């Protein structure tokens, strides 16, 4: 009786799956209105996570910590103390803005 020791090899290489390859969408956070810019009531000033910038005069804070203007006016970003920032909106007449331009 003839004994054969036969070794079979794979004809196709097994391909492993990568555990990377995913990423979340960017949230587009940051300052939306510059210092000295004229804004209308309801305009978003800053999109942020947490209170990196605190609400000041005539500025409201949304549920996701977004800062928005409560009145028409000019945006001002101010330092409060050593490492705290505050956004305020100071109301001015629209006629003054048009005359200045």
Swiss-Prot record:
The keyword Manganese does not apply. One of its GO terms (biological process) is translation. The keyword tRNA-binding does not apply. InterPro entries: Ribosomal_bL27 (IPR001684), Ribosomal_bL27_CS (IPR018261). Keywords: Ribonucleoprotein, Ribosomal protein. It holds the Pfam family Ribosomal_L27. It comes from the Bacteria. GO terms for molecular function: structural constituent of ribosome. GO terms for cellular component: cytosolic large ribosomal subunit. The N-terminus is cleaved by ribosomal processing cysteine protease Prp. Residues 1-9 form a propeptide. Belongs to the bacterial ribosomal protein bL27 family. PANTHER family: LARGE RIBOSOMAL SUBUNIT PROTEIN BL27M (PTHR15893:SF0), RIBOSOMAL PROTEIN L27 (PTHR15893). This is Large ribosomal subunit protein bL27. It comes from Clostridium tetani (strain Massachusetts / E88).
């Amino acid at each position: 009786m003839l004994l054969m020791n036969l070794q079979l090899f794979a004809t196709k290489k097994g391909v492993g799956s990568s555990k990377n390859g995913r990423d979340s969408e960017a949230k587009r956070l940051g300052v939306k209105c510059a210092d000295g810019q004229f804004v209308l009531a309801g305009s978003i000033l800053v999109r942020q996570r947490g209170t990196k910038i605190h609400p000041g005069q005539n500025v409201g804070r949304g549920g996701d910590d977004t800062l928005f203007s409560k009145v028409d006016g000019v945006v001002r970003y101010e330092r409060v103390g050593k490492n705290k920032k505050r956004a305020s909106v100071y109301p001015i007449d629209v006629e003054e803005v048009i005359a200045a331009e």
